């Protein structure tokens, strides 16, 4: 029994916990830019600042500087470079504070209401003796405001990006260009839960954690363009060779029972090291691209292209994927017999396209390699073997591919003040890269293995309508309307039509279907035996 609860209920003095763990957020952005040029050189320099105060008592602050220069050396040569440097600090605050704030009863006090502690936070609103003088109480949950005060989760980020290019044009119709784009990214996250936090209530005093990540990547593109007009005909041909590589290093450390409340800066003094880790990964990819664009009088348009990508994530026999595409378009408004509609019909174009795209982003760089765990030792006579394979590998992994057919219509009226598009598409994805559940008896402690497991079909409709309502020197008012409808359906799993219930995948259903049992009433023992004997009856999923 709590006399305080009686008073709160009689006076309708309820605590608005969601209001206490949230606030009004705001954001500010500032950018200063300086540009200039001479006869053959142009340059630009910019400085930016961003500051956000989040609704959940989180915050984000970012500084960045940009600089670029382009130079025409002579009639054949040109070169340029750009750089973007930034640093940011993200303060995530206490996740437990927000979650528990929305769970707390409005009958619980956030602050002492009188006495010498009036105005101070109540550490445990569900157990405090001032509220429950006879003992007991509904919960030992920590006051979310106290949790927030003693919790920190900060991430500092440093990022540097550059782009350097050299261009050579031996004749007017040919452009040769090579571009190097390196990028360096460093992240350091520090987490600290001191006294009077949820972590401490879970037996972890002065919990500190650091996570570090360094990543360096570069893309090197070399391309050749050929552009030529032959009367009413225009040809634009492109050939490109691209190299991409990324190296990432990471480390982590978790400690508890630090003697000082100094965030994560004195982890060497901690009594317990709960976890330590480090890691390295490398990803490489080579790409070839060929593309041909053709148009006749800007009326009939044709594009044919193909790219070949080789990824280090796959074994040599499955490393390369070929992804062709083609598209045709007809600008009906460019036909001579449409000249009478020019005053009200600005654009009318039909489009038809086909293309194949590839995806390898779902898997890590070493999913085709057998991984070992060093926690266990095996004695083979006089030889002690350290480690065992703990994750099953799949050497047959290959690219996930999506084949898409698209039919579209673009339209514009009244000098394109009203314009939009309609698209109908079908996307068939096959060799999906997904994890499959496996019995532990197969030798995997993870209970899963990556595979190219099935086929999924997406069909949909997309509509877009844009209008320019007012356009003047001092005022512009535009509106946009977008509608999209997509239907997703699993066609095949693991080469057949068998459901994979362990993963929640069912033939004919969406890949992320929400499913459950449909109650059909009480089943007697006799009915259960009859149903079990009839193998043709299956459980229905909705």
Question: Positions of the model-derived regions?
Answer:
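Residues embedded in well-ordered regular secondary structure
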Residues: 1-56, 94-97, 112-153, 166-169, ...
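Flexible, solvent-exposed loop segments that connect beta-strands
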Residues: 9-10, 199-203
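Intrinsically disordered, low-complexity segments enriched in polar/charged residues with Gly/Pro
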Residues: 19-21, 198, 279, 383-384
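Extracellular/periplasmic, surface-exposed regions of secreted and cell-surface proteins
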Residues: 28, 61-63, 67-77, 82-87, ...
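Core alpha/beta catalytic barrel or barrel-like domain that forms the active/cofactor pocket
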Residues: 92, 109, 196-199, 303
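Acidic, Ser/Thr-rich peripheral helices and adjacent loops at domain boundaries
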Residues: 99-103
């Amino acid at each position: 029994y709590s006399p305080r609860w009686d008073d709160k209920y009689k006076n309708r003095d309820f605590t608005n916990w969601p209001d206490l763990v949230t606030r009004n957020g705001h954001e500010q952005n500032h950018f200063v830019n300086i540009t200039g040029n001479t006869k053959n050189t142009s340059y630009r320099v910019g400085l930016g600042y961003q500051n956000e105060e989040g609704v959940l008592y989180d915050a984000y602050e970012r500084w960045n500087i940009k600089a670029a220069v382009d130079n025409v050396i002579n009639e054949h040569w040109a070169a340029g470079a750009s750089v973007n440097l930034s640093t940011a600090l993200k303060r995530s605050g206490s996740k437990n504070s927000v979650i528990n704030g929305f769970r707390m009863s409005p009958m619980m006090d956030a602050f002492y209401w009188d006495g010498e502690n009036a105005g101070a936070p109540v550490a445990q609103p569900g157990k405090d003796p001032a509220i429950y003088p006879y003992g007991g109480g509904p919960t030992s949950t920590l006051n979310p405001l106290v949790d927030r005060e003693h919790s920190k989760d900060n991430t500092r980020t440093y990022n540097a990006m550059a782009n350097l290019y050299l261009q050579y044009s031996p004749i007017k119709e040919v452009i040769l260009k090579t571009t190097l784009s390196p990028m360096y990214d460093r992240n350091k996250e520090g987490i600290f839960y001191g006294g009077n936090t949820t972590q401490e209530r879970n037996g972890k005093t002065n919990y500190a954690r650091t996570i570090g990540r360094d990543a360096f990547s570069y893309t090197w593109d070399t391309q050749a363009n050929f552009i030529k007009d032959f009367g009413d005909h225009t040809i634009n041909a492109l050939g490109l060779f691209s190299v991409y590589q990324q190296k990432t290093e990471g480390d982590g450390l978790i400690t508890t029972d630090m003697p000082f409340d100094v965030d994560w800066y004195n982890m060497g003094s901690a009594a317990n090291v709960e976890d330590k880790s480090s890691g390295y990964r490398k990803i490489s990819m080579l790409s070839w691209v060929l593309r041909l664009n053709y148009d006749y009088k800007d009326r009939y348009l044709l594009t044919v292209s193909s790219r070949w990508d080789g990824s280090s994530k796959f074994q040599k026999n499955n490393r390369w994927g070929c992804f062709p595409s083609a598209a045709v378009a007809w600008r009906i408004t460019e036909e001579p017999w449409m000249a009478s509609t020019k005053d009200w019909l600005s654009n009318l174009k039909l489009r038809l396209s086909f293309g194949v795209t590839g995806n390898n982003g779902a898997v890590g760089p070493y999913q085709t390699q057998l991984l070992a765990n060093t926690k266990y030792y095996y004695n083979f006579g006089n030889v002690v073997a350290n480690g065992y394979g703990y994750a099953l590998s799949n050497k047959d992994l290959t690219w996930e591919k999506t084949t898409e057919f698209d039919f579209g219509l673009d339209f514009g009226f009244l000098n394109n003040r009203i314009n939009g598009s309609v698209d109908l598409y079908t996307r068939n994805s096959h060799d999906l890269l997904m994890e499959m559940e496996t019995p532990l008896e197969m030798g995997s402690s993870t209970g899963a293995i990556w595979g190219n497991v099935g086929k999924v079909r997406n069909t949909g409709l997309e509509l877009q309508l844009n209008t320019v309502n007012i356009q003047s020197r001092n005022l512009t008012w535009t509106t946009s309307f977008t509608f999209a409808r997509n239907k997703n359906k699993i066609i095949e799993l693991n080469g057949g039509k068998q459901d994979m219930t362990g993963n929640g995948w069912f033939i004919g259903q969406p890949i992320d279907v929400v499913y459950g049992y449909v109650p059909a009433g009480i089943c007697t023992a006799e009915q259960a035996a009859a149903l079990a004997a009839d193998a043709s009856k299956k459980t229905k999923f909705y």
